[in-house]
């Protein structure tokens, strides 16, 4: 059964020529949950409750502790203070996003994939690296008509049931998504982002 009430995200990489967006989200906040049918609201409120659970965050922080310590110093996982915000994402064919690191207001980014089978296995998020050569190419691309690739592709997480990824946002957390092809359905996922400030908006 489909869920209504998605919000179009106006990210420049996601926009179609007609002004619509290939990426939509239902933020799990009081406003958007309140617009749902009673059954949907009950279901997604339960998901939000689980994702908000401190034990979930603590487990992520334990698994990602080396990266968190690199960013925040020699802290213990139980001493990390961060605020989870989550939502349901729908990416249509044509969606893409260039390699980016995520904004520094985010401490940890997590994404949980929701395919029904393995047909969309190639739809996962990709990781990249950019060397000194890549940074030079970036500057040359600003003045050249010929655009050369700045990034080297490292791997793509398989978009499979009961899978996903998590990473600490930092200077090298380059990730993105090549264009989703036509005719293979929408890409659904849950994202749960841990922010350092509880007042940062999450697609509100």
Regions found by a protein language model. Name each.
Residues 40, 44-49, 57, 61-203:
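Catalytic core of non-heme Fe(II) oxygenases with the double-stranded beta-helix
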């Amino acid at each position: 059964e489909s869920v209504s009430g998605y919000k179009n995200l106006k990210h420049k990489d996601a926009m179609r020529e007609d002004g619509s967006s290939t990426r939509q989200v239902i933020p799990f906040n009081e406003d958007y949950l309140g617009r749902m049918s009673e059954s949907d609201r009950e279901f997604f409120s339960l998901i939000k409750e689980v994702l908000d659970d401190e034990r979930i965050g603590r487990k992520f922080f334990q698994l990602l502790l080396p990266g968190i310590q690199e960013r925040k110093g020699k802290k213990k996982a139980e001493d990390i203070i961060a605020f989870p915000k989550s939502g349901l994402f729908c990416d249509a064919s044509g969606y893409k996003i260039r390699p980016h690191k995520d904004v520094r207001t985010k401490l940890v980014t997590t994404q949980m994939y929701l395919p029904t089978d393995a047909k969309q296995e190639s739809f996962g998020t990709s990781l990249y690296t950019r060397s000194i050569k890549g940074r030079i190419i970036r500057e040359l691309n600003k003045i050249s008509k010929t655009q050369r690739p700045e990034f080297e592709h490292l791997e793509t997480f398989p978009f499979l049931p009961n899978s996903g990824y998590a990473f600490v946002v930092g200077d090298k957390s380059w990730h993105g998504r090549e264009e989703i092809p036509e005719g293979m359905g929408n890409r659904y996922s849950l994202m749960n982002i841990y922010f350092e400030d509880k007042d940062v908006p999450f697609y509100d």
